[in-house]
């Protein structure tokens, strides 16, 4: 809901938006490509996307549960000026799905750090959206911002939007003392203000 609300505001300001749902894609697990001196990841021999996980799944889809669809994400990033990453909080961390995407972006960062080429992520802005019942969503957002900076994105300090329903780390179920549902928050003055600050931090 937070991502969709942000995209609506961005679109209303005249920007083209595209929503990619990685949960609907078959993204193969990252491989250990750092053998052989650490130059296997992003090798030009690893196909057009320079990713062995993708190339191997194309060569032998049965072994990998089907052909890898990470190129949908790669191409989406390549076409974008700004990328928003959204995740739930899982045990004080981001989701395993987002972690898989982060690991699969090694091939982009390694083109610069290993092969001395231009980083395809350089100059692209990124923002982070984090939602959870509790478990310190703010810390998850900050960690993700640092991760995307290391990958090569430009991440403004205020380009994060966090929803954490309760500050009580021991509260597993909702009760009347919790904050309102996120949907109610997003249409409130406070929620609209939060979206505006997030979007404007990205220059949108």
Language-model regions, residue ranges each:
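N-terminal beta1-alpha1 ligand-phosphate binding loop
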Residues: 1-13
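Hydrophobic alpha-helical membrane-association signature
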Residues: 1-2, 101, 140, 191-194, ...
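A generic structural motif
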Residues: 12-18, 153-154
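Glycine-rich phosphate/pyrophosphate-binding loop and the adjoining helix
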Residues: 149-204
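Hydrophobic/aromatic beta-strand patches that form the interior of the parallel beta-sheet core
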Residues: 18-20, 84, 127-130, 159-162
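Helix-loop-strand module that forms the ligand-binding subsite of alpha/beta enzymes
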Residues: 47-50, 55-151
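Residue-level "edge-of-site" marker
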Residues: 23, 90, 161
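N-terminal beta-loop-helix "entrance" segment that forms/cooperates
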Residues: 18-49, 54-58, 168-176
């Amino acid at each position: 809901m937070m991502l969709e609300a942000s995209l609506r505001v961005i679109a209303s300001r005249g920007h083209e938006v595209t929503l990619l749902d990685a949960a609907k894609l078959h993204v193969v697990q990252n491989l250990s490509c750092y053998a052989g001196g650490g130059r296997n990841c992003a090798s030009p021999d690893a196909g057009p996307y320079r990713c062995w996980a993708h190339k191997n799944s194309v060569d032998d889809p049965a072994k990998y549960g089907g052909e890898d669809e990470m190129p949908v994400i790669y191409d989406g990033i390549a076409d974008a000026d700004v990328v928003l990453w959204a995740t739930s909080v899982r045990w004080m961390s981001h989701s395993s799905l987002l972690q898989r995407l982060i690991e699969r972006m090694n091939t982009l960062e390694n083109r610069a750090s290993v092969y001395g080429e231009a980083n395809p992520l350089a100059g692209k802005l990124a923002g982070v959206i984090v939602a959870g019942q509790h478990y310190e969503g703010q810390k998850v957002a900050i960690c993700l911002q640092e991760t995307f900076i290391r990958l090569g994105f430009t991440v403004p300090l205020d380009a994060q939007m966090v929803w954490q329903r309760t500050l009580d780390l021991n509260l597993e179920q909702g009760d009347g003392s919790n904050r309102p549902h996120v949907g109610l928050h997003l249409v409130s003055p406070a929620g609209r203000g939060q979206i505006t600050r997030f979007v404007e931090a990205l220059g949108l």
